[in-house]
Structure formats: C-alpha cells, structure tokens
Amino acid sequence: MCIRDSFKQDVVDALVEEVHPQGIYERSDVPVRRLEGLEQLTGVMYGTVPDRVEMVENGVHFWVDVKEGQKTGFFLDQKENRAAIAPFVKGKTVLDCFTHTGSFALHAGHYGAKEVTGVDISAFACEFATENARLNGLENVVHFVEANAFDLLAEQSRAGVKYDVVILDPPAFTKTRSAIEAARRGYKEINLRA
C-alpha cells in the first residue's frame, strides 16, 4: 500500500465533513499505478455518484463522465488557461486539437469565436463534446471532428487551410525515460503543423 493510499479514508472523511458531497468516486486507475506496483481502483467511496455530472467553469456548462471519462473526466488544472483564451478568440476561427470533452473549444465559442473546430481521435470524446456544445447552445458555432490530430494538421497544411487561433493540448507523449526522444519528435511535429 502506498502512503497516499493509507490516508485515503482520512481524506474522504474530511471531504464529507467539510464539503458535504452527494458522493465521492475514486479513479485510481491510471496505468502508472501498475508500474509502481499499486492496485488500480475505481468505485464509489461515499454516497451516490451519477454516471454524468454537470459542472460550470467560467460560465461554460459541461457534462462530465466521472466513471468512464479519461482520468477524472475533466482536467481542472487547465481552468486558468481556458479563461486566458478569451481575448484571443473573439470573432476568430479556432482549431482545438486533442479536444477531449471540448473544454477549450467550448470556451472559445462562449468567448465569441466565429467558428470552432474541435478534433479528437476518440468517437466517445467527440460525441460527449457535441453534447456539451448543445448544452451551451453553441452547436452552430462549435463542431467536433473525429480524427487523428497529426493527420488532420498535415492534411490541412497541404490544403492551405488556415485558422486564426490553434489550441494544442495533447496528452502526455511519454510515461517513461526511454520514450523521451519520440515524445520530443511528436511535440515538434504538432507545433510545426499548427
């Protein structure tokens, strides 16, 4: 057992006492836990947790799939970055690569972008992001395309397609030291194509 795991129940108890949540759901299922010899765990730790939760960030509404979504279903660490795009997107065409739930794309639409295209390789992510666009009344401004962002960027570059703003928020390309060089090439490629 990891020291962090040994304090898990203390954290749950503190959250219940201070925050009074409807439920707490554990997502200790990232692959790196296996590398560290830790068990991958998911499940309700307290109360009840619906399949989807609606949240609001910077005035934008999102459905979040806590149980099946990537990692926790929403990347809260990018909140300030999503807010920071506001002065750059009004009246602009925007491409959001690796869109996941559409968080950057929907913020761009909310902040007045003329047209937004979100790209993700996952059909599930694109469907979920499309639902989020409808939830915000942005379905006529924000659209999602299921595609490999590397391939799409290359195709659009060859075709001369241009966007006023390109957002790149890729997943981690490496989890191990041995893959660092390949990751560098990947990051360089997407930045050159953008």
Task: Name each region found by the language model.
Residues G47-A194:
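Rossmann-like S-adenosyl-L-methionine
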Residues M1-S6:
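Conserved small/polar residues in nucleotide/adenosyl-binding loops
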Residues F7-F74:
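Non-catalytic substrate-recognition/targeting regions of SAM-dependent transferases
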